[in-house]
């Protein structure tokens, strides 16, 4: 016996009822790219956020492009973050450029124990301004903050550079999870606000939000 696709079979000649379509498990989608020199911890950063785990041991560089999805809820809105992990090596840079145009947000990482990765941030920002959307969300992240004994880049240096380019700044640790979730939640809140805020909804500034959360975290650490 054949029937209408998507219909529910009934008895006694009753008209079949269509099954309700499956509702998506998210309300909006945002494409986020992780950028920065090879070895700054982009892959570990992504896995810490996605799975709450840290990849220790042998370092394996990302080849080309990889991505993972995760849905986060901000202010009652489910935001699906499609997070692209990019290779930092120069030979893959042309591949990375092709993905800039569709990105709504970019997380730019450097390693606080590696001066060259910090010095190269300006070059990365030049590429971003050349290839990415004009209104793309950018956040600067000083990763490997758990390795304080090997630090060569002061937190103040990261703050100063971020202010120069008008972007929010966080120090993070893919190993301990420090500020990893905050970085993605801040991005999700910004994307949600841009997608269509209500007239009576207060304006959202991602830099102000990040700063307020940093101060809140600092206060809690002394309690």
Curated annotation (Swiss-Prot):
Gene3D superfamilies: P-loop containing nucleotide triphosphate hydrolases (3.40.50.300). One of its GO terms (biological process) is regulation of exocytosis. Changing residue 43 to N: Stimulates interaction with RPGR. Loss of exchange between RAB37-GDP to RAB37-GTP. A motif (Switch 2) lies at residues 85-102. Residues 221-223 form a propeptide. Residues 1-23 are annotated as: Disordered. Its EC number is 3.6.5.2. This is Ras-related protein Rab-37. It comes from Homo sapiens.
């Amino acid at each position: 016996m054949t029937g209408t696709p998507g219909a529910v079979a009934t008895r006694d000649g009753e008209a079949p009822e269509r099954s309700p379509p499956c509702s998506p498990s998210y309300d909006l989608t945002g494409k986020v790219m992780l950028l920065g020199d090879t070895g700054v911890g982009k892959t570990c950063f992504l896995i810490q956020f996605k799975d709450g785990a840290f990849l220790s041991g042998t370092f394996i560089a990302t080849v080309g492009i990889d991505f993972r999805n995760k849905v986060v809820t901000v202010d009652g809105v489910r935001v699906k973050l499609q997070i692209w992990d990019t290779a930092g090596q120069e030979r893959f840079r042309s591949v990375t450029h092709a993905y800039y145009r569709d990105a709504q947000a970019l997380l730019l990482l450097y390693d606080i124990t590696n001066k060259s990765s910090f010095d190269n941030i300006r070059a990365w920002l030049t590429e971003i301004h050349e290839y990415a959307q004009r209104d793309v969300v950018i956040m600067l992240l000083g990763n490997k903050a758990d390795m304080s004994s090997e630090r060569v880049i002061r937190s103040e240096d990261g703050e100063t550079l971020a202010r120069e380019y008008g972007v929010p700044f966080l120090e993070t640790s893919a190993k301990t999870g420090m500020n990893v979730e905050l970085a993605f939640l801040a991005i999700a809140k910004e994307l949600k606000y841009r997608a269509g805020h209500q007239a009576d909804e207060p304006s959202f500034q991602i830099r102000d939000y990040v700063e307020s959360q940093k101060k809140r975290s600092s206060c809690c650490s002394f309690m």
